[in-house]
Amino acid sequence: MSRAIRLVFAFVAVSIGFFGGMPMSYAASTTVQTAHDFSFTSIDGEDLPLANFKGKAVLIVNTASMCGFTSQYSGLQDLWDTYRDRGLVVLGVPSDDFGGQELDSAAEVKSFCTINYNIDFPMTDIARVKGPEAHPFYKWVADAHGGLAVPRWNFHKHLVD
């Protein structure tokens, strides 16, 4: 197993250990119960409900094409190639929230990822991952798990089952 994959697994394991024991504080007035209640728009413009991945582990990663961490795409693709048949889904969420490091359109992101990293794991359209305009999934995670769950930079990871 490559060093990058081991590092991703170590990070995810630490995150699960930390966030797994935190109480849910999401408002009872909402009908959202799990991550599977959310939907993204795919990089191709199609509806992409997280419910499609029920029963699988989903590693949700906010990405950026022009970041110093962009090389993590290689490790994420390795994870997808190695574990997708065993129930792991890698979901890339391109975001321009940190330093303007994402390309201007979903088509450009898809082309960049295909040409440079041969990415074939599912990806969403460009989305906000922090602040008042954040995608509802990211708002829910922040509310449920507090400030440490809010991405502070690109390639922040959330593992959901």
Language model feature labels by segment:
Residues 62-66, 154:
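Amphipathic alpha-helical repeat scaffolds
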Residues 1-4:
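N-terminal secretory signal peptides that target proteins for export/translocation
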